Every structure is written in C-alpha cells, then in structure tokens.
C-alpha cells in the first residue's frame, strides 16, 4: 500500500486554486428589509458525479458551458442535503472527487433591469472545494466545507435580455494533509488485489465525510451602496449596557449612517450616527444563558440606516442585527458570564441525520432544540466544524451557550503543521470569526479538536493560530480540545481554558469502571497544577446500542453507559467546586461514521439514537442537568418539560 504522487489532488481534477476570487469584506446574514430582497434556491437541483478515471471529464468537456442535462444523465438532488445517502447507488455513497450541481433561477424583472440593484449569490456550505459559474461564466471559488461564500453576479444578470440565470457548481470532497479537516489519498498498487488507479480516502476523524450542498443557497439584493459589515461588542457598567459598533459601507465614500437600538417591544432605547460609536442602554436587560436567569436570552435589535446621494439619485439601505448585551471573562478557576460563574452542562453534537446526512433541516433543528431544553442542557460545542448560521441564531434566541469550533479535527500528520496548512487554518478562523462574531451565544472559540499537539511543530502552530484568533476577536477566550498528555501538550500554554477529552474504561481498561474515579481525578489535578486554568471535560462517554441490556453492566449496553457516566459525575461533582467549569457529554445523538469493524453502522455514543429517541442515559443526564441548574441559576421548575413555545422562527 503506497500513497499516490504529491499532487494527489491533480489526479482528481484541477489544482486547488486559492480562494482569492471569493468576495472580501463582510458576511452578514441575508435578511430582508425595505432595501433588500432574497430568493431561496433550495429544492431539487440537477446533479451528476464525474465517475471518469481522473475525475476530469466535467472540466475537459466544460459541463458548465451548457445545461448539465446535455452532458449526460443527471439525477434530481435535494438542496440542502448530502448527496451520499439520497440514492441507492453504492458507488455514489462513498464517492470521492468532483460532483456537479445545476439550478436555473428566474429573477424578478427589477433585479435584471435596475442598475441600482446589486445581486449576490450566496452558498451557505459546499463541502469541500467549490467552483461556481453563472451562465457559464466563472464567478467564485472557495475552499472549506462549513462556511458561507458569495459572488456579486449583478453584471452577469443585468447584461442581457434574459431574466434567468443558470447556476453551476463543481464540488470536490477530497481531503489532503493541508485541508481542514485533513486526510490523505492512498493508492492501492497491488495489481493482484486492486484494479488500476484504485484509491481510497483516508481520514483522521470519527464521522462520515458527507459532501454536497449542505446549507441553503440563495440570491439576495442590496443597493449598489450598501452596508457591508457590522461589528458589535458589548459591555456593562453597573446597570447600563454598552454597545460599541463599527459599520463598514461599500459602494461610496459619501454616506450618512443612523443607528437605533430597539428593545423587544420595539422601543428605541439608544441611538447614534456615524460608522462607529458607543450606545449606552440604561436599565439594561442582559443576555443570560438558558436556566441561569428567569428571563434568559434577551435580544435587542440594532437598526442601521444608510443614505447616500449618488449620480443616479438617492440611495438607502437598511439592516437589522440582533444584539445580546453580555460579558465573558475567565479567571484561574471560573468562567464568568455577566460577572457570574457559569458552569457548562451540555453536549457535543454533529450535523447528522438519516437520509439528509449533514444537510440543514428545520424540523430536525427544532427537534434538537426541544431535546436540549428538555434535557436541561445550557451549552454545546460545534464539534467538529462550524454549524449552520440558523443554528447559531436559535442559540441566541434560546440562551444556549456555544463553544464555536473550527473544522480543525484530525490534525495528526507532520505535514498538517506546515506553513501551507497554517495559512489555510488562519484564513478559516478569519471566516469563522467574521461570520459568528456578533452572536451573544458564542462565548469561546475552539481552533481544533484532538490534534497531535505533542509534536514539535505544534507549539508554533497553535501559538500563531491562537494569537491570530485573539487579534480577530479580543472579546472572547480561545481554546482547543486536547487528548494529549498534560506534560507533552505543546499547545496548552496558549489557551485560556483547558478542554480535555477522556474515555476511561472505554478505549482502555475496557469494562473496568472501577478505575474511572482515580484516573479522572488524577488527570484533572495534573492539568490544573501545571497550568492553573479552568478545565472543561469536553468529551466523555460510552458506545451504547439502544435496547441492549446487561446486568451486571457490559460494554455497549444501556446499563454500561449509565454506569460510566455516574462514575464521571462523582469526580465532576468534587472538582466543579474547585476549577472544573463544565462537562459536555459525547454525544448528543448517534451519528454516521466510515465503515469499520469498530463501528456498528456509525458511532453509538449518543444519549439519543440517530432518530432522536432517548436511551436510558438521557434520563440520567436530564436529572443531573436540572439538578445543576437548580444550584447555579434562576429558572422554571425542572418538573416542567421545556420546549420552544409559540416561536415564529422569524430569524
């Protein structure tokens, strides 16, 4: 078994272009306003995978120059969704290489005829590398499968008599040592076992590498002079809230800005002018986490109004940004929100479900939030990549605290610490902070999960990466999640909070739950003695197949999962009185992985099944989390199940 040539990606299609053609500037969520419209392109798209030996046929035949159906047979593919589980084709489920999507959209006449209208194509997520054409013209490229990118297509749709546009995407899910997450292409050269050119995609993470258009695709408009970006940071001075804002405008240097902050009743509580300033909010309603306050998740609305006088006449633009006023701080032993100790009792998740894979789905999202609130969870980590923007918006609305993680999972190889990898990781953190900086629910950035941080190049890599993230956003702490030994971890000196994953009596000392308390307590003590920083138990858990029962408990039974959690909780209850500031179970729900003898149709460590039905551990954890909530905050009675009540979901 040998690895292919250094240019493994070349064998699968064009070289990795730089993402310089993606738009610079802001990445505000597309909201409708008096000056802005949007047209969703979700639904059925034409789809075709390039099964040619080199995966080059689509480029050689220029499939983007004509309707995709003219290139050969196509499939109907729902967007958003992963393409892997929708059909019955075994080859497509594990396909690696270029796939092609196409959709024709009819535009409102004003969009195509008004030169004062700017038309933007926005792709919420295309995993992993995407090239975009409109009417056969190349408009954008983007590397990375979890963050949005845009292209201004105004000139293309306003240059002819047509009121429609044909949008074509080529997407490649190949992972290399320099992608995030990393992977390798391994060519099988034994002719007695494998056909010529046979290769496999190796990954270093434990979830399925779903691919496709995972999040909404849409068109939206702005005026040609428009609000491009808004940055908000908040503070508190006694009972006065402080909202510092900075607004960026594109299209003209001559404009006026008015800024209004409205409370939940629509009353203006503060106002200002200009591109930057500070708003003071007397008798402020703070944004509090779920179960930490009787009135959690209070959101103000920041209304920004732009006016400009252009040669063609006056221009105006309006944008409304939800704002939660809160503070975050870290001490040697505490994580503070609004100056009060906050204890994370929550989950790790995945964007994963039957059939849709990682595709965004509103019913699934609402179900998950209902379960989180029922569970008494106040937090989750976006393991192991940024989640959809709509997820973050619901976290803002319902007070669910977020550790926002980059796709830096599986950084194992020395090559993945190269300057090429570091530069890409810096760019990804820039995109992540740009997208999520204004969410009050986001209280900490996580730059990676379980890297080989004991390798020598890890010290410079994480020192640089964390410093860069703090420079982008000085208002939040930064961490990465480790499973390295406390003495060997070269990245830990640079984090603000120690996040540790451990699986005592699961991945070692199989079945011996009696050693958990000693091993876990020793690990906590070693980490704290070395770094004097607060600690989060960022992962722990056990594989459990729903309906398997054994007493005395045996591995994979529901009883074993419960017993393991109980042993962890005994130590957590001791150490949370000292320096442990949180616990996040692995995992919220079962999820799909690559096939292997160690995985029975995916990872079964969920406290819920993949279909969101509870295992016995869910009830154990619910009892614990409501008990923790009773000790740490003001909330409704734990006897009452929590759900999303009377929510219009008008995000």
Curated annotation (Swiss-Prot):
Cellular compartment(s): Lysosome
Protein name (Swiss-Prot/TrEMBL): Beta-glucuronidase
Signal peptide extent: 1-22
Gene Ontology molecular functions: beta-glucuronidase activity; carbohydrate binding; signaling receptor binding
Main location: other
Complex and partners: Homotetramer.
Active site (record annotation): 450
Keywords noted in UniProt: Disease variant, Glycoprotein, Glycosidase, Hydrolase, Lysosome, Signal
PANTHER family with a match to the protein in the record: BETA-GLUCURONIDASE
Segments traversing the membrane: none
Reaction(s) the record says it catalyses: a beta-D-glucuronoside + H2O = D-glucuronate + an alcohol
GO biological process terms, semicolon-separated: carbohydrate metabolic process
Involvement in disease: Defects in GUSB are the cause of mucopolysaccharidosis type VII (MPS VII), an inherited disease reported in humans, mice, cats, and dogs.
Matches recorded under SUPFAM superfamilies: (Trans)glycosidases (SSF51445), beta-Galactosidase/glucuronidase domain (SSF49303), Galactose-binding domain-like (SSF49785)
Effect annotated for changing residue 166 to H: In MPS VII; loss of activity
Origin: domain of life: Eukaryota
Gene behind the chain: GUSB
